[in-house]
Swiss-Prot record:
Residues 86-96 have a biased composition (Acidic residues). Belongs to the asfivirus D129L family. This is Uncharacterized protein D129L. Residues 86-129 are annotated as: Disordered. Residues 103-117 have a biased composition (Polar residues).
Amino acid sequence: MDINPLLYLQAFNNDATTFNTQGHILEQQSDSPYFDTFANAMQAYLDTKQGGNDEEGTIILMDDEDFNDSESLEDFLQMLNEEELNDGFSSDDEPEEHVILTEDNQGEPSETPQATFDITEFIKTEDED
């Protein structure tokens, strides 16, 4: 598969690694092999989206030609962050209450942890040829 956009993957409380779509490691802060690190980060992201653990994560796909300076990239990341946090309901709406009936709780709303996304830092790597 010959795709040009970069895949920026950050898994908080996990190894944060930046990959491109051909699978080459642009920056890695761990001694783990590529596939182990990628699988761990993807699992953390999926668990977070399902509300299954306390880790935070996000995956961002973008074309580096569209975001060739850090200012426009920061604007894009901020927009994406706000979109994720506000996805599903407007400021006038309230989140729906989910009820799970079990033997322990009959009709009580569940306290499922919600996924949160925090894009606080972005490291832009340049080709140094």
